[in-house]
Amino acid sequence: MIKPRVETIEYPQISALWHRRQKGDFLDGYRVKSSVRLSDAQNVGFQFPIWVKMLLSVRNQFMAIFGLKSGSGDSFVELLRSFELGNEAERVIGMNDKHLDFRISLLRDGGYIYMATWVRPHNMFGRAYLAMVLPFHIVICRNICARIARAYP
């Protein structure tokens, strides 16, 4: 099996995420070659493997200790699969909480599927949380993109 090439990129300026960005925010970007429809990319990308579900479960248990939004692993996965804002060019979902706000974008442009996460930490806990989950976040995002490219080359 050929390993899909997931590129780390500056997210395209056409994204709705850019109007949110301020100094101190986090915004990453990835892309893979694929001309799949966003609805299909969304369905494949957010059908998480068991190791991701386990990480989300640990995250949710940790967040509940601090009284922050956590939901069950399944409800968080459902949130990520719900993409309520958008069209066939871009879909954005997210959540606001006491410690940070986040949005995830899937965008289709020029034969590529792009994925980005925007985060605005509100306090020290939000910044610490972001620093703690970032290594896992990168692996999960790259995995999502690779699974999309494998399913729809």
What would you call each of these model-derived segments?
Residues 1-71:
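Hydrophobic ligand-binding cavity/cleft-lining segments
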Residues 25-31, 90, 112-114:
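Intrinsic-disorder/low-complexity, polar/charged segments enriched in Ser/Thr/Lys/Arg/Asp/Glu/Gln
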Residues 72-109:
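Hydrophobic-ligand binding "helix-grip"
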Residues 106-125:
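Short acidic, glycine/tyrosine-flanked loop/strand segments centered on an H-E-D-like triad
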Residues 119-140:
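A short acidic/glycine-rich loop-to-helix N-cap element
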Residues 149-153:
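Short, highly charged C-terminal tails/helix-capping segments
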